[in-house]
């Protein structure tokens, strides 16, 4: 039976793989959005995506595990976006 630290490493590895695969497929679209419709900055756009994921968790409509992994991924991206914003100012 895996230990708690092993489980944490496993979950974080899944999040890392997901983020790197999406970054390879879509580029930095979460951190550098095209802004065709919304003019919100990347931090605000990520907060909107996180709200959407939290709504799905509350409703339980999607595969719960996938939604939670996506949510953790968006939270990581939010931290990256906030760090970028702080460095730019």
Show which residues each predicted segment covers.
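Intrinsically disordered, low-complexity regulatory regions
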Residues: 1-89
